[in-house]
Amino acid sequence: MADNQIPSSVADAVLVKSIEMPEGSQKVEELDFNKFKGRPITVDDLLQGMKHMGFQASSMCEAVRIINEMRAYRDPTTSEKTTIFLGYTSNLISSGLRGTLRYLVQHKHVSAIVTTAGGIEEDFIKCLGDTYMSSFSAVGADLRSKGLNRIGNLVVPNSNYCAFEDWVVPILDKMLEEQEASRGTENEINWTPSKVIHRLGKEINDERSVYYWAWKNDIPVFCPALTDGSLGDMLYFHTFKASPKQLRIDIVEDIRKINTIAVRAKRAGMIILGGGIVKHHIANACLMRNGAESAVYINTAQEFDGSDAGARPDEAVSWGKIKVGADAVKVYMEATAAFPFIVANTFAKEDGL
């Protein structure tokens, strides 16, 4: 072999011949800001420019497409729309994304909601006191000595939770009174988590609240883990205050209610921000109808640990929670960074905002 020739074994290893790409293969496209010179750049400009960028930019644009198709559907016989289940974790209500979630509920863009206890109480607490920016590296012991509770790079003064107790306990008293007065009557009151949230949404009477709008628009809000947070603390304290009488909250009636909504849906769509109970509760309801027709997951969890949060949509297909052949995507992004862009190009776009 001549010194000026590449060894054949090296050439065979490195210079592998490519096949012809199939007809219609999408090329990677670049976002060229020169195209927007001399005019304002819109959200639509950005999303269209990111569509074929690759990685999570393309996944986010796929989420936009799926949600827009979700919203455009009409049953050919009844003209019924897609039943859209929205799920989100409590930290998103603590963050400024709360306003985006409130917008969806205020304008009746979703059919039902599932969240955690924190996702309920933090909404009401933010009507009673402010949440502040902090730092992910703020020292826990220092914050504890100052009565400040950290949520990522946010802090909530402990006094906000005291204000929440002052507000919610009299309502719990009234609910117990109504429950006891109805015993043995034809209209006996059976409180459920969704009924409790509905009542609190009415009582807060504040347009900044997500659940005020859920009450006003009669959008059911489910919280199977209602006791897992400050609201649970208040219910615990109330058991002593009210003893021997006890407020009863029935989770069985609520599981029947959410599953029935899924079963009766002409078409079901899931938009789930975060993971855990909010993700699985919606997916499991859709199992009752052999799966949702479309799904958008937005979270940063990985699947290698077998967690519910990390699971991709295809895992839900294996369980019958998303239909075979359904339109689904998982966007591996933190929801506060991704969801405002998605809403701007879906729900808010129709509203002309």
From Swiss-Prot:
Spermidine binds at residues 121-122, 233, 280, 306-308, 315-321. Its cofactor is NAD(+). Its EC number is 2.5.1.46. One of its GO terms (cellular component) is cytoplasm. One of its GO terms (biological process) is spermidine metabolic process. It is an enzyme of class 2 (transferase). NAD(+) binds at residues 90-94, 116-118, 122, 228, 275, 300-301, 334-335. Pathway: Protein modification; eIF5A hypusination. The active site is at residue 321. Homotetramer. Catalyzes the NAD-dependent oxidative cleavage of spermidine and the subsequent transfer of the butylamine moiety of spermidine to the epsilon-amino group of a specific lysine residue of the eIF-5A precursor protein to form the intermediate deoxyhypusine residue. This is Deoxyhypusine synthase. It comes from Neurospora crassa (strain ATCC 24698 / 74-OR23-1A / CBS 708.71 / DSM 1257 / FGSC 987).
